[in-house]
Amino acid sequence: MLLRLRSKLGIHRVSCEGNDNFGSVIEKWANQLRLNVDPDSVSVSTQPGVSKLMTEIAHQGVESLGLRHGDMVTVEFKVLDTEEKNVSEKEMTNMTVSASTTSVPISSSHNKGSIRGKVKESALDIELEGETGLIPRSRSSLCRHGEKGMCEYCSPLPPWDKGYQDEHSIKHISFHAYLKQLDEVTNKKSSGSSYIPPLSEPNYEINLNCAGGHEPWPKGICSKCQPSAITLQQQSFRMVDHVEFQESELINQFIDSWRTTGMQRFGYLYGYYKRYDNVPLGIKAVVEAIWEPPQHDEQDGLTMDMDQVVKEVEDTDKLAREMGLERIGMIFTDLTDTGLGDGSVYCKRHKDSFFLSSLEVIMAAKHQLRHPNVSKFSETGLFSSRFVTCCISGNLNQEIDIATYQVSIEAEGLVEADLISGSTHPSQAYINETNDKRYVPEIFYTRKNEYNLTVKQNAKPAFPVDYLLVSLTHGFPKETDDDSTTTANTTTVFKTVAGFPWTNRQAMGQSQDYTELKRYVYKACTGNDLAELQAKLSNFHFLLYLHSIEVLNQQEWSLLIRTVTAPTLHEATEPLLNLINSPGWQTFVMILEQSM
């Protein structure tokens, strides 16, 4: 729990446990401020006008004093030596919490916006944070008021309303609905106290720098440095609600690798995040392109040279950012043909087997940890991830289908602390043993027994991996009623998905070379149809290959990016004409003319 200690130096937070002696809390607070406090002068109070000497209550537990998480305690004290441990105001008001990818400054002063002003969130998050997300309701038969009135039967519902979830079959509420629900409980508007970040990431690692006066693990351990027991629960919210593939041809081209070779395939999803109005305050991941890293495909899996993959992924990420895209997820196949000749595949993933294997869950958690979500409502400035995982496999009708998932924040914590590993049973995650480098606490999970009663069960040696899964919905842009074209056709980044070979498919007999380049784009380059040329250029894999041959300089490449990402031909015309008249483009056309 966190206690807020108010003194003449401001308000400071101290982390503690309910059974800690209150004297240790004051000691932590004094060490935090680097003060040489006279212990006989310290008095504390939780109510105005009622104070107690520290010497009287130092031995009592925090909870026994009636203190709860977030409570404010007023501290009065005298300093023995004001010159000892000279603390500047800057040192007292600024602390830095380091995360794996960034450092987020967090102020410990009484300023209510301490964390909020120092973390740069996405425009989407800022937009959703500014909305209430209230669910409107029309008048019902129980209403007894006029048209302009409102009562409990027709007043708007909060975005986390359980009844609305059940009625619309929403298994997980959106992240921002969960955040508003949590923030309402943690920071009540009537209290007027300093702001407490409602989000915190679980930390299941043992503290190797414990101040308890003992040797670090494995030579010593105490209740303060060891992680508490873990009870696994289904996560009630999801960071992303929906995955939208801008073109069905994206999936068709990706599956073609399996159709051609019978081998499995893996790829990364590139796109962006957008609001999703089908759920209150929802977010969807919009997939614009799939990029396949170098891999050696097999019938039951695949292998990769990670050094090569990391280098190529970094280069692809950089080019994608120039196009306004980011790596938002991963996708892989698990397909086995039935041999009936009708295109049917075996259904291997269902409620009686598994949805994601334990190894796949761990892989998803590692990817999510590498792509953290920035949030000013978190203690560290980071909270979970929006990285999604998609699996293409057979459904119950033996048809090829897509399933989309994330793993819970508990899964991220378990993987980061190295507490779980894969097992021979894909539906079970194995709990690692305690060793010199890690301490494994007790892990439990709840389940329904044969009497339909909820019971808590010890998770060792393994537990169902479904407790770590968060399911998402998926689909394609809906067709409009007026012209029967997809709504994505006016907003999609890339106009063409097929036609030019995808990257890293040499083993399938699909190479990217000058011959393929000429076949794909030469006619459009030498013609007079600007719309056709823009559509041909607007191809993710064509752009990656064109960049690799280094025929365009940086200015010409920028013109090309402006051309292919322009939403309309009118906006693309000017940069396209400038590109056509550039020396680099003329050289490119000459290379195509001389190619076989």
Swiss-Prot record:
| Cytoplasm as UniProt keyword | yes
Q: Which UniProt keywords apply?
A: Cytoplasm, Endoplasmic reticulum, Membrane, mRNA transport, Nucleus, Protein transport, Translocation, Transport
- The gene that this protein is the product of is NPL4
Q: What is this protein called?
A: Nuclear protein localization protein 4
Q: What is its main location?
A: cytoplasm
User: Topology in the membrane?
Assistant: Peripheral membrane protein
Limits of the MPN domain: 243-383
User: Which family does this protein fall into?
Assistant: Belongs to the NPL4 family.
Q: Where is this region: Disordered?
A: 88-115
List, in alphabetical order, the GO biological process terms annotated in this UniProt record: mRNA transport; protein transport; ubiquitin-dependent protein catabolic process
Instruction: List, as start-end ranges, the regions of compositional bias called Low complexity.
Output: 96-109
Q: What does this protein do?
A: Involved in the import of nuclear-targeted proteins into the nucleus and the export of poly(A) RNA out of the nucleus. Has a role in the endoplasmic reticulum-associated degradation (ERAD) pathway.
| Keyword field contains Cytoplasm | yes
- Give the organism's phylogenetic lineage: Eukaryota, Fungi, Dikarya, Ascomycota, Saccharomycotina
Any GO CC annotation of this UniProt entry: endoplasmic reticulum membrane
PANTHER family the UniProt entry points to: NUCLEAR PROTEIN LOCALIZATION 4, NUCLEAR PROTEIN LOCALIZATION PROTEIN 4 HOMOLOG
Localization annotation: Cytoplasm, Perinuclear region; Endoplasmic reticulum membrane; Nucleus membrane
